[in-house]
Amino acid sequence: MAKLTKRQKAIASKVEAGKVYNFEDAAALLAELSTVKFSESFDVAVNLGVDPRKSDQVVRSATVLPHGTGKTVRVAVFTQGPAAEAALAAGADRVGMDDLAAEMKGGDLNYDVVIASPDAMRVVGQLGQVLGPRGLMPNPKVGTVTPDVATAVKNAKAGQVRYRTDKNGIIHTSVGKVGFEAGKLKENVEALIADLKRIKPASSKGIYVKRVTLSTTMGPGLVIDQSSLNA
């Protein structure tokens, strides 16, 4: 049997198996256990009462977190004319049409979000095999295909997170960084859960938000007592 590392021993000694944690206690413990040399993210996993095999129960959307994620977001926009000027003014890192598509086909994909105006989809449509596997393909369901590209850029830069239920009916997303004030981190999680409840599929029956788990990039996952959240 492999020996536990010092970090693993610390986690094993402080994390109670099967315990449900108050949000503030969970955030504080995870921050305490974060001893790596980089700034870890706080991530949340929400188990939803949906059947992801049914298309009408796939939950896919985007939420602008009130305090962002703490990450610098690079945004590329496919658009032209006045909309291109508006996108640049809103903070887009790169704006273009065929020229931008050529760059991406050539391997320049150093972007976190790709946005497109509807008239640009004739160009973006050629990039499915390039953008799709990376989760960058613009989609109207998450607000990345829109005539109002400037607002989409502002939302992305402000810390908008995008998510989709996986095959087990769970959504995963980052909600902040270790070092965030607990109150701000909590408000981010509450905003996410409120949005999830708002878009609950009509065909979903029974308990919708089954479990909320908070973790750090390299840390354990702690189950959160939902009564400690205002959502």
UniProtKB/Swiss-Prot annotation:
Similarity comment text for this entry: Belongs to the universal ribosomal protein uL1 family.
GO biological process: regulation of translation; translation
InterPro entries documented for this protein: Ribosom_uL1_bac-type, Ribosomal_uL1, Ribosomal_uL1-like, Ribosomal_uL1/biogenesis, Ribosomal_uL1_3-a/b-sand, Ribosomal_uL1_CS
Disulfide bonds: none
Name of the protein described by the UniProt record: Large ribosomal subunit protein uL1
Gene it is expressed from: rplA
Record keywords, A-Z: Repressor, Ribonucleoprotein, Ribosomal protein, RNA-binding, rRNA-binding, Translation regulation, tRNA-binding
MF annotations from Gene Ontology: rRNA binding; structural constituent of ribosome; tRNA binding
Assembly and binders: Part of the 50S ribosomal subunit.
Gene3D superfamilies according to UniProt: 3.30.190.20, 3.40.50.790
